[in-house]
Amino acid sequence: MSVSKKDVEYVAELARLEFKEEEKDSFVNDLNKILNYMEKLDELNTDDVDIVVNPYYIENKYREDNVEKSMELKEVIDNAPESLEEYVIVPKVID
């Protein structure tokens, strides 16, 4: 598998990026070097290796996960800078 200039232009268009021609050529070269290096993985013999979906079986080792009483709605609304009925009004962060 190799990356062409057309591939780089397509991904750049998806990401809404613009590159000079020499930058595109550099990306093609760099990406092909990376892919060629990754092809070395095909040489590995993994017949005797067990399949592992997730090597890190994470457990909560720090504390028990206990349910605790939270603040009453009235207390939350009273402490909010701005509210409407039972909703806290916050500044808009997404267009």
From Swiss-Prot:
Family: Belongs to the GatC family.
Encoding gene, per UniProt annotation: gatC
Domain of life: Bacteria
EC number of this enzyme: 6.3.5.-
InterPro entries in alphabetical order: Asp/Glu-ADT_sf_sub_c, GatC
Enzyme class: ligase
GO biological process terms, semicolon-separated: glutaminyl-tRNAGln biosynthesis via transamidation; regulation of translational fidelity; translation
Protein name: Aspartyl/glutamyl-tRNA(Asn/Gln) amidotransferase subunit C
Keywords: ATP-binding, Ligase, Nucleotide-binding, Protein biosynthesis
Species this chain originates from: Clostridium botulinum (strain Hall / ATCC 3502 / NCTC 13319 / Type A)
Catalytic activity reported: L-glutamyl-tRNA(Gln) + L-glutamine + ATP + H2O = L-glutaminyl-tRNA(Gln) + L-glutamate + ADP + phosphate + H(+); L-aspartyl-tRNA(Asn) + L-glutamine + ATP + H2O = L-asparaginyl-tRNA(Asn) + L-glutamate + ADP + phosphate + 2 H(+)
Name of a matching Pfam family: GatC
Quaternary structure (record): Heterotrimer of A, B and C subunits.
Gene Ontology terms for molecular function: asparaginyl-tRNA synthase (glutamine-hydrolyzing) activity; ATP binding; glutaminyl-tRNA synthase (glutamine-hydrolyzing) activity
Lineage: Bacteria, Bacillati, Bacillota, Clostridia, Eubacteriales
SUPFAM superfamilies (UniProt xref): Glu-tRNAGln amidotransferase C subunit
Biological role stated in the UniProt entry: Allows the formation of correctly charged Asn-tRNA(Asn) or Gln-tRNA(Gln) through the transamidation of misacylated Asp-tRNA(Asn) or Glu-tRNA(Gln) in organisms which lack either or both of asparaginyl-tRNA or glutaminyl-tRNA synthetases. The reaction takes place in the presence of glutamine and ATP through an activated phospho-Asp-tRNA(Asn) or phospho-Glu-tRNA(Gln).
